Amino acid sequence: MTRRGVLSRIASGIILAWGWKRAVIALLAGALSSLAMEPFNAWPVLFITFPIAVWLIDGSAAGKRRGVPAAAMAGWWFGFGYFVPGLYWIGYAFLVDADTFAWLLPAAICGLPAYLALFTALGFALARLLWRPDSLRILSLAVSLTISEWLRGHLLTGFPWNAFGYALTEPLVLAQSISVIGIWGLTLLTVAIFASPAVLIDGGTNTRRRWAVPAMALGVLAAMTVFGGIRLKLSPTQLVDNVRLRIMQPNLPQDARFNYSAKADVMQKYLSLSDRSTGPKSTGVRDVSLLIWPESAFPFFLSREADAMAQIAELLPKGTVLLTGAVRPPELPPGRRITRAYNSIYAIDHDGSILSVYDKLHLVPFGEFLPYQNLMEKIGFVQLTKVQGGFLSGVARHNLELPNAPPLLPLICYEAIFPDEIAIGNNRPGWMLNLTNDGWFGISSGPYQHLQQARMRAIEQGLPLVRAANTGVSAVIDPVGRIVAELGLGVEGVLDSGLPAPVAPTIYARVGELPAAVLVALVMMLVLLRKRPPGS
């Protein structure tokens, strides 16, 4: 039997599968697809799994099985299989305080993937509406999943984690396309490229025509590689003059970060680590311009603790600024009890004065707030951080101006995964700062996925990104995504580095999602116009 004959038999088995067999095929294909993401980056598996997705939708149009619901159900199983192994690490957060939250572990591991899989189901259903029995069905799937992934990233606060386009962000040469078309444009190309082998089983065409579509897909992949290689070559890492960074990664256990009685130990660890000598020529914190501590670093309100502020002032030499995460109380009348707070970044001068503050805008549902907060608290629910009333959201994203370094754009925790929220406009900063605490997720794939998505924001904007994480991975990333320096997951220490200089604003930085929107519109028009009957 020829290779095409074997492939055709496999495809026929998938197309004709029904009931539980069809669900299992979709589930396994989705699970295998998760290996395309960090830390595995085994994206060639998508050359297997996305053709299976095409054949599953082919099967929903076979005989009496015709219909959108059949495609949607296949999409749901594919998405569920994709998100469970891709997001399993979220369950670790529910074990930090196991006595309170362990009972919610099944909901975290299965409930969130079940919800996110609804968007994959929507993508398959939309693809089925646009379906036709020729090579254009590849584009139908690509544009439909791009739309559904965009919706996943925006509806109900949005969660674009592990969008399919992230499969083509490693190696770094492939990721450079994101500087033009963003993650949503890259998602469209990713699905189209990897789904293309599905047409090899199509009948009624000669061998040359059958191979034309995969050949074009490989051509796009080659063009992305060439473009990325040229961009990397033309953008060597350059450093800003007279700016030295020190990132402190304390690797504190989660319970210490929320235990007020541990405040003295926490401060002592921060102070000693920050002034650690890293070599025979190092003089500790006196060598640095910017000392950087991670997200919500203290088990207390920093600005209300005079002793802690005095210790920071004593630590910092003249000309050094501390950038640190901290929980910030709102301004209240005297005597009013504090019940809510902001998740913030402080810039603190050598005399202990607060130079500027940024309050986190995009809060984490169920981590920093609960939907219908008051009602949920009345029936006994609390979010993971146990802040009564939930955290407050900031008013607007703004640059932090510094006396000894270029202005920075602050991003706290998973704010770095939302590309279109980094609206820089005319007030372009010199770099981006991402403070996070991935210690919630243990030694798992979660922190690596978070790092990779933050790297893409650097490439999109042409700006360096500096990342300080409680347990890692802390890193200094140049404007084309190179990791200049890093401190690994689960490591205690400090990371010294220069500050990479930005490159010219990218196309994405100038026009945002416009190229991706144009690409989606053109593909949609091509699919719709070709569906019209002759003479219409």
UniProtKB/Swiss-Prot annotation:
Domain CN hydrolase: 248-501
GO molecular-function terms, A-Z: N-acyltransferase activity
InterPro entries, per the entry: Apolipo_AcylTrfase, C-N_Hydrolase, C-N_Hydrolase_sf, LNT_N
One Pfam family from the record: CN_hydrolase
Enzyme class, first EC level, given as a word: transferase
Record-linked Gene3D superfamilies: Carbon-nitrogen hydrolase (3.60.110.10)
GO biological process entries: lipoprotein biosynthetic process
Membrane topology reported for the UniProt record: Multi-pass membrane protein
Main location: membrane
Active-site residues annotated for this sequence: 295, 360, 413
Keyword terms: Acyltransferase, Cell inner membrane, Cell membrane, Membrane, Transferase, Transmembrane, Transmembrane helix
Recorded metabolic or biological pathway in which this protein acts: Protein modification; lipoprotein biosynthesis (N-acyl transfer)
CDD domains tied to this protein: ALP_N-acyl_transferase (cd07571)
Function according to Swiss-Prot or TrEMBL: Catalyzes the phospholipid dependent N-acylation of the N-terminal cysteine of apolipoprotein, the last step in lipoprotein maturation.
Protein known as: Apolipoprotein N-acyltransferase
Taxonomic classification: Bacteria, Pseudomonadati, Pseudomonadota, Alphaproteobacteria, Hyphomicrobiales
